[in-house]
Amino acid sequence: MSPLNDLKINLNGQYTFFLNQNVISKYSGSLRKMIKQSKKKRNKKKRIITIEINDFPGGPDGFELVSRFCYHNGEILIDVSNVSTLYCCSVFLGMSEKFCFSNLFLQTEKFLEEVFYGSWSDIVSCLKNCEQVFFQADSYGLVDKLIFAALNKISQNSDDFSSSSLSSFASSLSPEMAKNTSESDGRYISRSVACGRSNEWWFEDMTNLSPKIILKLVMIIGAYKTNIKSLVLTRFLLHYLKTKLQTKSRTTTELMRNKLEYSDLADTAVRGVISAGTRTFSCRKLFWILRVLSSFSLSRESRIGLETLIGEMLEQATLDDLLISARGSRESGFYNVDLVIRLLKVFVKNREEEEEESRERNMKEIGKLIDKYLREISPDQNLKVPKFLGVAESLPDSARDCFDGVYRAIDIYLQSHPNLTPQDRTEICRCLNYKKLTMETCKQLARNPKIPPEIAIEALKSRCGNQEHTTSDVKVANKSFSCRYSEEKKKPVVLHLEITEKLAERLKTKGGYNLKVMDSFREGL
């Protein structure tokens, strides 16, 4: 160790620097004071003075920059990639003109003044450098000043990005900053507009910034968790969160570290979407927004607000829209069935106030969609019977002219879940309206070995009893079945069914009607 290195600095409890007291204290008032105090307390036999410094801006990299400045006689190359760090270090260590002419604080302050009046790219680069020293940069007001400068550039070149808050903070800037638009900015923005980006020319650059800085921007313009009126800001937040989600595999640690900030940004984006409403966002776009924002721990209030917006226009949805993967454990199912049930409840409740003709048309549309959805989710091994019924029974009976689609979904479910109990097989058929089954489907149901016998009989009884008859005996088009219907209601109804031998063995006398097996056509089923 060189005899000149008589100062030991332990930085943030992890790093150690050996420096010369005279060199370092020449520029730093804080270090000069700490050295003086340490000399009073130290053992006279110890030549090296030890100083502990915690929470230093930029950590060891920041302190190395300061040391380089001191050892190069107060000179260092300052650029947009390090000026924010150097500025915070100079404030932290008290490197003002009081101790040295043209000290680090003055040099960084002059450079930043040029940045405030300079190009868009320089402002963004300085904001990026603030991420390394965010706590200090925010405390010293540097983040606010850079965001003001950035927003000033955006407001000058984005017609739709205007609000009273922009006017208020713009007035706090100097006249030079408020009216300045550099030639380089003009060329950059012109290229963006030519590419069709218009008011979104700044999106990609700002997306590279940390959520802490974006959240600070949102707070400055008064849009934090409020019903923001700026559609451009809403679109930016959606773009920002989508981009961060796409890089999640590479930045999982960063996302977890900033979980609270991302959640706040997502909630703010939802407020903007709700303010814009369905006139701005299509049903498909709203589903996309829900997929993206649900990954950032939305608050319950935001989730309900977004789901309500989607539910009110659910008749415009497609099957792909509804097939949203469940989050977390797959034990509850591959698809987010609970979400669809909630959306259906909103839809049905919202349609109660519609005119009858419009309500009936929309109900029929959503009925067809949900039947497709049921068939799609039925093979899921983790889909429980109550969840299946929750979807099927979310719509009123009037939403379906025919229940064939529901039966097909039940058939798929039974084939995919061979270990269901007899009680579950009976329970899942609860959602069927037998009178709205076609005769062909009714016959398929009766042949289906997965369907409990009592369900098959009840379906056939309801279907035959629902026919209009002109004679006492009715022959169904397919000769597999024949029905004799007695109009004397006081007497038992005799229902003759041609069914499989296996089913015949399981049939018993039920209620007020007798079941009689016909042997003539067993082989045909």
UniProtKB/Swiss-Prot annotation:
Gene Ontology CC annotations of this record: Cul3-RING ubiquitin ligase complex
Record Pfam families: NPH3
NPH3 domain segment(s): 200-466
Domain of life: Eukaryota
Pathway: Protein modification; protein ubiquitination
Coiled-coil region list: none
Keyword entries, A-Z: Ubl conjugation pathway
Domain BTB: 5-79
GO biological process: protein ubiquitination; response to abscisic acid
PROSITE patterns, A to Z: NPH3
InterPro entries xrefs: NPH3/RPT2-like, NPH3_dom, SKP1/BTB/POZ_sf
Family indicated by similarity: Belongs to the NPH3 family.
Function: May act as a substrate-specific adapter of an E3 ubiquitin-protein ligase complex (CUL3-RBX1-BTB) which mediates the ubiquitination and subsequent proteasomal degradation of target proteins.
Domains: entry comment: The BTB/POZ domain mediates the interaction with some component of ubiquitin ligase complexes.
Protein's name according to its UniProt entry: BTB/POZ domain-containing protein At1g50280
